[in-house]
Amino acid sequence: MRNRILFSFLAWVAVIVSVQGKQKDFVLQSGQPVAIACSGSEAPVVRTSLDLLSRDLQTVLSATAHIDTNTGNIIVGTIGQSKLIEQAGIDISALKNKKQAFMLAVSEDGKLVVAGSDSHGTAYGILEISRLLGVSPWEWWADVTPEKKETFRLSGKFRELQSPSVEYRGIFINDEDWGLMPWSNKTYEPSDVKGEIGPRTNERIFELLLRLRANTYWPAMHECTLPFFLTKGNREAAKKYGIFMGASHCEPMACNAAGEWKIRGKGAYDYVNNGPAVYQFWENRVKEVAGQEILYTLGMRGVHDGKMQGAKTVEEQKAVLNRVFVDQRGLLEKYVNKDVTQVPQVFIPYKEVLDIYHAGLQVPEDVTLMWCDDNYGYIRHFPTAEERARKGGNGVYYHVSYWGRPHDHLWLSTMSPSLIYQQMKQAYDQGIQKMWILNVGDIKPAEYQIELFMDMAWNLDKVSFEGVTAHLKHWLERELGTSCAKTILPVMQEHYRLAHIRKPEFMGNTREEEKNPVYRVVKDLPWSEREINERLNAYSELSETVEKAASKVPADRQSAYFELVKYPVQAATQMNRKLLYAQLARHDKEDWEKSDAAYDSIAALTQHYNSLENGKWNRMMDFKPRKLPVFNRVERNAATAPMTADRKAACQWNGAEAKKGNAIVCEGLGYEGKAAEIRKGDALTFSFGNLKTDSVEVDIRLLPNHPVHGDKLRFSVSLDGAEPEVIAYETKGRSEEWKENVLRNQAIRKIVLPVTGKKSHQLVIKALDEGVILDQVMLYEVN
């Protein structure tokens, strides 16, 4: 009995100790006020983030937040300058020596502690709470109404530590003439000043960047837009949101030459023949913004997107740039920091400037080298070992929207997420880790591509671990709900796959900025009647599924569904119908009325887009950017040449279907979504049976990317152990082959090989350089 009493007593004591030692959960209840402790000395970006969190708490929990300097349910602070964090009782050592990092942790007494390694980290930590509440970064920009909650709870064991993979992460608003500029200037922030995009608009953009954990902004710079720094209130808005201001390849020293030279410059924008005036133009701007967080672009091109004036040869241009570097860095040393190596600077070898760089241009060691894609998603240069070792590091400027040759893609933002992932992962692995900037056009409708890009820049390992499909799935679930996402995920995958084969903007088989006007005439694509009908049927299925799935979307997310899914998918469907039915009609195989009806559908869809949310997005969506011929109603005429004949392959494989070899399948990439990377020195083997022919034509179809190391991109082909044939397929920018490649998203090489009478044959394709990505292999009998 005595032992039993002792045992019961000890058990009771153990329970008491257990209860007393149990860590409390962090809990917020609907309608209950939330106290947030934060020092008044924190940076503006921290205060801004707290304002956004307060708004989110009100939306989700109907809870009013109060900011206090001493106590609260939530404790916020930056290490090294916040006593609140020092006294919070959590281990913050993991934050030391990190940039823009944050930690979220529930303390023993059930308080949520938000600690940042610097002000940006603290801000991102605050808005991580908004993410945990279920608030999408696209809450305002895509009308993703947050779901109401009765309770918000985090376990007492909750710990979260995050820091960026890439230091500077941001967007470039570009080609804004038909979307963001008129929408801002006439709808969202009406102004009597022509082309003004003011601080109200920019604050919305900066809020989006902050919620996406981005920190860098290249503002709109076309001639139609009043330059950012000439618009009252814009600079202050950037400071409020902790945004680093940068500028594109043709805007050195934070000067928008396209919009400002005619206002503030004198004479020609020519450093050879009018150097003092150009120097003064730059000097005036540096003096104005010396106290702002600026990433200064060095170098010089033309006033807009063209070559520099006054220097004709590459050697002359190189000499001018060497002089420009010295003078520009002298200005930074004079007005910004006497130690110029402490001023963030970037050099962007875009288009013809890359040729100057390759000719031996010496860029100062502390300047970031920013490499570019070819405007169609394929990065032109990856840093060498020497370039990776530079103090300034490496960056990338990447496009999901573009105006230029061979054809614009400004409308529907159909860049393959799988291509973005493959190229940006390769960029990171090759040492491009300092700065990532995405040309996003008008932001809408590139929402998903923007988030994928920013998520990779923030935490590349996480995106890499889950894969593109899972990332898209989670995004759709957050924006539209689990039920809808399950139905729409395969729709969006197929939407991107079909557009990878041919973007909606390229369906007229036209080209822009060519001397011969025949390129602007809508004409047949080199597709057979069977190929056309298969594509039409595929799009019809997508459109029908999207229409039916709308019933699964909550009423308060219907606008989001239209913006993120219905408009892009159905507009792409109708664009394909318009051009492909016209192609069939030219050959008397369809009625012209079907093409005209598709045009009318595009117009109606766009009108509805611009009427959403009581006209909130009026003027944002234009289905005829630049009024290119491909966007018009198709002119009725008869074909003058027969339609492409159907050609059936004896055998066909995608990259993943190799019988032997280490195929690194690129998830969702390519014509069939199963392209495969072949590492240098590795080979893939494809097997086929006996054919009634003595020779075969082998069509090898690859991703039209650029060399990873050096200037070569080669593979070899061998049949049945014969001597391998070496084939190169690298292209020069703006060459005819490059234009064809980016329009069809394939580089094609053909070779005829002899076949013996063996019952089984082995076709071996071996990568001789890094970067070979095999999409498809076609085998045709040669009669």
Residue ranges of model-derived segments:
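Bacterial Sec-dependent N-terminal signal peptides
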Residues: M1-K24
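Contiguous, structured surface segment used for ligand recognition
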Residues: G21-S163
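The substrate-binding groove and active-site-proximal loops of carbohydrate-active enzymes
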Residues: V113-G116, D177-P199, N215-T225, W261-A277, ...
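An acidic-aromatic substrate-binding cleft motif
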Residues: W138-K194, R200-A220, G392-G395
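C-terminal non-catalytic alpha-helical accessory regions
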Residues: V144, K148-E150, L472-R626, L684
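Gly/Pro-rich turn-and-neighbor structural signature
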Residues: K149-L154, H222, F229-L230, A237-K240, ...
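Structured mid-domain segments that build the active-site/substrate or prosthetic-cofactor binding neighborhood
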Residues: L210, N215-W218, T225, G233, ...
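Extracytoplasmic
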Residues: D622-N783
